[in-house]
Amino acid sequence: MTPKPNTTSPTNNLPLLSKDSPDIESLLILNPKVQDKANAVPSAVTKKNKHNWKRNEEKGCGSTCGESKLKNDFRDIKHTTLSERGALKEAMRCLKCADAPCQKSCPTQLDVKSFITSISNKNYYGAARQILSDNPLGLTCGMICPTSDLCVGSCNLQASEEGAINIGGLQQYACDVFKQMNVRQIVSKEVRENRNASHKEQVALIGCGPASISCASFLARLGYTDITIYEKRAYIGGLSSAEIPQFRLPYDVVDFEIQLARDIGVQIETNRPLGKDGLTLAKLKEQGAAAVFIGIGNPEPKIDPLFEGLTIENGFYTSKNYLPAVAAASKPGMCGCKRTPLPTMRGRVVVLGAGDTAMDCATSALRCGASRVTIAFRKGFTGIRAVPEEMEAAKEEKCEFLPFSAPRKINVKDGRIVSIEFNKTEQDDNGKWYEDEEQIVILKCDYVISAFGSTLKEDAVLSALQPCQLNKWGGIEVDSTTQQTSEKWVFAGGDVAGVAETTVESVNDGKIAAWNMHRYIQSLHGNQVSETPELPQFFTPIDEVDISVDMCGVKFENPFGLASAPPTTSGPMCRRAFEQGWGFILTKTYGLDKDLVTNVSPRIVRGSTSGPLYGPNQGSFMNIELISEKSCEYWLQCIRELKRDHPTKIVIASIMCVYNKADWIELATKSEEAGADILELNLSCPHGMGEKGMGLACGQSPEIVKEICRWVRACVKIPFFPKMTPNITDVREIARAARDGGASGVTATNTVSSLMHMKADGNAWPAIGSTKRTTYGGMSGSAIRPIAMKAVSSIANELDGFPIMATGGIESAETGLGFLMAGASVLQVCSAVQNQDFTVVDDYCTGLKALLYLSGAESLKNWDGQSPPIEKHQKGKPILLQGQKKMPFFGKYRDEREKLEAIKLSESNLLDTENYHFASRPDTQVSRVPTVEDVIGKALPRIGPYVTLDNQEQKVAIIDDDMCINCGKCYMTCNDSGYQAITFDPVTHQPHVTEDDCTGCTLCYSVCPIPECIEMVPRTGPWKAPKRGVKPSVEPGTPKVVKVDQRGRVILDTTGGMQ
């Protein structure tokens, strides 16, 4: 037998201090332990146990039994829906490819790479702006696009094990956050100032569906001021409102996108059908319309002659009367009704068709009470036209599928449908399909919904479309490259034009039509317009925010520039950077020709700080690259050319010399004469150059730094900034020496000296030559951001008002704003470009504008930058039942929760708008937008020495059971790295914080995978002294801080006074 361990001290019979007490041992029962034996549990037991933990559907019964559990449940069903956490994780996974195939596969040509880059940088406005610039219905399309057949189908990550990016979900998330910002669209200043008489021409659009909304939006962005959409229904949105179910596309989304169009002058008139009340093409032209767009869809259903005479009273629907009836009863805000009953669907429903509409009919039927839904179609599963996303949704909701079935007869008894008969379909060896009347299937049913497509056949409408020519299928004859009809002034798009089969293709029809309508209208005024579309982008007041900044009398268009690094290896690279929008560049550090270098290779490697993460978004790089290999005259000439061609951009010459007065004077003078706006003195290169008596060899000595600064100050008039090294005990000493030597400011900081990869055979990476030697290199990237942030803030606090150029881990507008608030004036970027390309600057500029604008909005004070408050959710979707103790989201608890949810849904009013965010005008009001100068140093008053912190305002952790996914990470870290203050229920796996034991260390909060599932809240009750283990001879208090001087030094009261 294993001897029982001692629990008391052999000397004084007291409990062992180095052993957990019995209550802690009980708490640790589920804490991981190293296993020294294999596990063995009978399968009969594991088969039973697994049901206690399942989060997915049980396999087995393939259909619903009795009334559908989905009745009245119009909550979001999309697997693509994301929370902020999910969106950031997915966006970080994106490769942001060159010549991205996802964009090529998008009908509207969305710049997918760019908007996902913005999402990964938490610039949701920038992402939404990119999306809405190319697709005014970006939120709708993010929700319902058949992405597997479009962008996602072309994603290069399809070639990897982890699979393609959830592009639709990311698009939905970014646009939804912008929707919550409630910022109006405006016409850009450039367009407003260039309007002429042609922009007053009257434009009419018929039908308020996706194609018309898109067309009208682009025409308004082009500057047209008299745009009217005529809609036959009492509500707007077309098919998006009437036929796409609420659980896929909520009405508040449609309302939001139409409000954006109204913001820029688009007028909408409802109850104006084509063919009635004088609304015809001829009348519109008589009334002064210069151009007309037809976007009426295909309003009539295709009905098999088999169903002639059948009505709703018999139990027969078409998709064209069923889905609008469901929408009217389930889409809050659509028609202004307070309560409208859903179509009754008790019993068995058969849906005919295999397209997306058929799947919508089937899943809607379950929500109307159907006990069983069968989708019957003529061909096999391989011939289903519905996109995989739609079919999988129907399958998951237990719809049945009946392939190879063509309806032959509907049986009616006492005026109600009782069954439907099918012939089996076959395909011969030549690929021709036929019906085999010898193989008959009779399916009992109570309702039949026909979803065999739609057409345009109403005589009044066809008459109103004259003189437009019709094609042989009865649709409008349209030029598919311009959307122009046989009449030059009439254009058409969407279903009625015959090419578009999806919402996004309809949107694109409207987009193409808008440009060609613009060309046509301009031609009437004798103005020539390019055949290649030049459509204005989406624009809001955010885009008018000024992010320029003055530093040392030099005006920067924006605070983002390229550091002296690989992105500025050559003059042409610097020029391209300016063309993409960077506010300034630093040349690659150059010296006199006598100090020219030759680099080794390999020399720039991915860091080890990101673990096994390959591809973009590396947390760090390590380089052993030296300064520029190009001559001094090369760089002087490049500076001359860049300043000549880009006079408003700022060129900063990065220079380096040995510790020699004549050399510094010569190089600084030549650089100033070439036209450099500012000099940066590279006194901090951490590898290679120090061994030559340059770089770090100069920058670690305050005396040398001060003297070099004096030499340069004496010979140039332009500002200069010595570049600080982080490889020193106190960077403030070097900064102070630079200031005392006459420097205009400093750059903080250079890379951190490091050694990255060590392989199993003892070789490091990078390994040079046949001997595989290596050296210490400079680490850059987000991994050094905390070091750089500390350097910037400490210098700013030490030298009040001293200008600082920050560098080190700046990779977004948000991180850049952090450096500005820590005291920096402008921001240098390197590793973020190495991870991506020069175009990231557009994301940084829009992101900074948005951050400044939103900070001035009182109504958004509870936002964290561009991140809205986190609502309680599971899988990115709101929780219907909140505060249900002891009821996690798995096993039997999941079943119990679903039953309670069904009860609540059955009692709810589906048309209640309370839980939806509808667009409101006036939009978010901003009192004053801060400038960049306003935010510089804003955080400094709250950054200081440790002894200024109050150790009696304690906080403790609290865990939200509604958001918890029961992983136990908080429990484990508290046990093995903290204070054993969290219990973990063995049955529900719900963690709970014991407040008396919690010290507020925040480890649990830090490792929790769900943001804000754990919150740090003030401790209740009076302050309690820490558990000392053994009672101290004296219980210390907190020293009183008498004074904190400007250099951060703390003066304490040492007379014994304690707080």
Swiss-Prot record:
Entry's Gene Ontology BP terms: beta-alanine biosynthetic process; thymidine catabolic process; thymine catabolic process; uracil catabolic process
Protein known as: Dihydropyrimidine dehydrogenase [NADP(+)]
Cofactor details (free text): Binds 4 [4Fe-4S] clusters. Contains approximately 16 iron atoms per subunit.
Co-factor requirement: [4Fe-4S] cluster; FAD; FMN
Catalysed reactions listed for this entry: 5,6-dihydrouracil + NADP(+) = uracil + NADPH + H(+)
Pathway listed: Amino-acid biosynthesis; beta-alanine biosynthesis
Residues reported in the UniProt entry to bind [4Fe-4S] cluster 4: C998, C1001, C1004, C1008
Family: Belongs to the dihydropyrimidine dehydrogenase family.
Annotated positions binding [4Fe-4S] cluster 2: C106, C145, C151, Q171
Annotated residues for binding of FAD: 207-211, 231-239, 248, 274, 494-503
GO cellular component: cytoplasm; cytosol
Originating organism: Caenorhabditis elegans
Annotated ranges, domain 4Fe-4S ferredoxin-type: 84-118, 955-987, 989-1019
Active site: C685
GO MF terms held by the record: 4 iron, 4 sulfur cluster binding; dihydropyrimidine dehydrogenase (NADP+) activity; metal ion binding; NADP binding; uracil binding
Keywords: 4Fe-4S, FAD, Flavoprotein, FMN, Iron, Iron-sulfur, Metal-binding, NADP, Nucleotide-binding, Oxidoreductase, Repeat
Gene3D superfamilies per record: 3.30.70.20, Aldolase class I, Alpha-helical ferredoxin, FAD/NAD(P)-binding domain
Residues holding [4Fe-4S] cluster 1: C94, C97, C102, C155
Its biological purpose: Involved in pyrimidine base degradation. Catalyzes the reduction of uracil and thymine. Involved in the degradation of the chemotherapeutic drug 5-fluorouracil.
Note: Worms lacking dpyd-1 exhibit increased sensitivity (decreased survival) to the chemotherapeutic drug 5-fluorouracil.
UniProt: [4Fe-4S] cluster 3 binding residues: C964, C967, C970, C974
